[in-house]
Amino acid sequence: MEQPAPQPAYVLHSRAYKETSALVDFLTPQGRVRAVLRRARGKGGSLVRPFVPLEVELRGRGELKNVGRLDSTGIAAWLHGDALFSGLYLNELLMRLLPAEAPYPALFEHYTLTLQALAAGRPLEPLLRSFEWRLLDELGYAFSLSQDVNDAAVVADGLYRLRVDAGLERVELFQPGLFKGSELLALAEADWDAPGALLAAKRLMRQALAVHLGTKPLVSRELFRKR
């Protein structure tokens, strides 16, 4: 039988399983994979922590794999304070939204770079908004920031609302939750220094993600709020 090839991975979530094992959700270039790690109190179990770059060998053909081998491939991204809450938020988004065993190699790379940037103390908000947008795009939920639902160009002095199932729609009368065209055009260029861009990005991503996350609150968001 052909030996499965090791692949890079990060731990998204883990919990005790039976007496001495752990049930671990990994993020790999091949997607989110759930596997049983036996003898979790040994050397392998000490590696089952978030933000540690790993190499994992996964065995089995079913949805629930078995960990054949698990090794660290580098130094863990040392996150603390708000950066730690941000990393946990990314993990929870991936656990909630990423389908099992669907390959997303570019998203894996973006996740790796985001962890490194968080550990380096880069400003949190642009990193989080960029990751949220990349996740929406990879899952097929993204929409144009420079054109509205009628294929008209977004104009700086216009007002727009998000129709999650379609995209941005221009409106003539002010109402809560709208976005300025100038803000949307700044987001399209990732111009985080533009007036109002970061706040607009946070509102836009929250609206865009809400329909896919459902009504169950994000634990990481509650922890961040109570910090």
Swiss-Prot record:
Which Gene Ontology cellular component terms are annotated? bacterial nucleoid
Using the record, list the residue span of the signal peptide; answer none if the entry has no such feature. none
SS bond list: none
Single GO BP term: double-strand break repair
Q: Which key words tag this protein in UniProt?
A: DNA damage, DNA recombination, DNA repair
Could you tell me the superkingdom of the organism this chain comes from? Answer: Bacteria
User: Which InterPro entries does this entry report, sorted A to Z?
Assistant: ARFGAP/RecO, DNA_rep/recomb_RecO_N, NA-bd_OB-fold, RecO, RecO_C
Family annotation (Pfam families):
RecO_C, RecO_N
Q: What does the protein in this record do? A: Involved in DNA repair and RecF pathway recombination.
Give the PANTHER family listed for this entry: DNA REPAIR PROTEIN RECO
Family recorded in the similarity comment: Belongs to the RecO family.
> What protein name applies here?
DNA repair protein RecO
